Curated annotation (Swiss-Prot):
Highest classification ranks of the organism: Bacteria, Bacillati, Actinomycetota, Actinomycetes, Kitasatosporales
Domain of life: Bacteria
Annotated pathway: Amino-acid degradation; L-histidine degradation into L-glutamate; N-formimidoyl-L-glutamate from L-histidine: step 1/3
Record note on modification: Contains an active site 4-methylidene-imidazol-5-one (MIO), which is formed autocatalytically by cyclization and dehydration of residues Cys-Ser-Gly.
Similarity comment: Belongs to the PAL/histidase family.
GO BP: L-histidine catabolic process to glutamate and formamide; L-histidine catabolic process to glutamate and formate
Annotated protein name in UniProt: Histidine ammonia-lyase
InterPro entries attached to this UniProt entry: Aromatic_Lyase, Fumarase/histidase_N, HutH, L-Aspartase-like, Phe/His_NH3-lyase_AS
Amino acid sequence: MHTVVVGTSGVTASDVLAVARGGARIELSGEAVTALAAARGIVDALAAKPEPVYGVSTGFGALATRHISQELRAQLQRNIVRSHAAGMGPRVEREVVRALMFLRLKTVCSGHTGVRPEVAQTMADILNAGITPVVHEYGSLGCSGDLAPLSHCALTLMGEGDAEGPDGTVRPAGDLLAEHGITPVELREKEGLALLNGTDGMLGMLVMALADLDALYKSADITAALSLEALLGTDKVLAPELHAIRPHPGQGASAANMLAVLAGSELTGHHQDDAPRVQDAYSVRCAPQVAGAGRDTLAHARLVAERELASAVDNPVVLPDGRVESNGNFHGAPVAYVLDFLAIAAADLGSIAERRTDRLLDKNRSHGLPPFLADDAGVDSGLMIAQYTQAALVSEMKRLAVPASADSIPSSAMQEDHVSMGWSAARKLRTAIDNLTRIVAIELYAATRAIELREGLTPAPASQAVITAVRKAGVEGPGPDRFLAPDLAAADAFVRDGSLVTAAETVTGPLA
């Protein structure tokens, strides 16, 4: 099993994916253990002094002016976890919770939180045991971080609340810890606050979204190329010299991908010297510009994610010179903004894919294809309602593109009077990515069927490889009407598991 070592200087996106999705084992580095102990020594020294220190000997949020006596401080830390574990709604996915916990452990190990080494080790032990706290959909405003979701995780650390075991059953967390030989932690000064004051949920979802969208943008380039081919479009617009004079990196990459997929096709318009069309519709001709802009959005979001993965987000933080200082680094705005940005880009990619699909089905714009790609139009409806489904998905994606980060709402008696809503931005982006996968799958279904209806013209070798593979995957080709939902589900799985990209790359080699 792969092992991820957590040190003091952050983690990588690959580390997050390995833990969240791959079940990688976690170890703490010796450097991290030393830093944890040193920071804890600073907190213990401050806790012994009469002066109040936020998070160590005071209340929280709007109650920060209350000085807490020594004998109540352990109760204070337990209470903040219990009271802040106030989430509601459906359970959050296992991979999201694992990413959330791992990223909190990353910050704890930075040596800036004052959490004891044994608490950090218990966090790692819970993840290694495959125990997943029950975290709910609603409860985070994205500032001070993802409070309620992280509190549910901290509750498990205390042996309280519910958690999911390795077998997928939900049981009392205390029972699961006992079965795996894990001793619940007794929280001390600052530890409760340090376990729940971070942007780890939204960051984990951002990292996973970037991985998913990387694959989807490649898939969308392939389906755009298939649609261009099916519509007898021209690939001249994909020429490298045209994209070099507007040098957006993503645009060039998408154009190169499409050109590679179309190499050797007999359907693209440049083979027809007397072709009356000199320009294709925008949804075909401008595919690299739209997908490329999305790719550049991914690059910006990835830069933000990398900075966050190298950050220590807590309030207050322990500094090497012995100070414990309040700060605003828990505000999720940097992450929230790019999550919203990605939702906008994803919605537009879905929109342009749907427009190409609609063009394939319209006999007045498809350049010789039968209405709705039907076998016997009138008797058969073909893919008419598949496009309805695609349109419904696009419509929802447009609603999901409305920025959550622009909708701050005050809380905590106006002490926390501006929040990021980054968790909400991340949740809606996950839905948008699911929708986009389905939209691309429907374009794939329509485009491969349309190419097969172009009898007498040989598609590009890469296109043929995709058609052959998707048929083997259970997606039926042209013919009389049949129950469509299973075909669409099979096409969705073909895109989702990477088979589409794999099939194309058997001919093209690695795509960008």
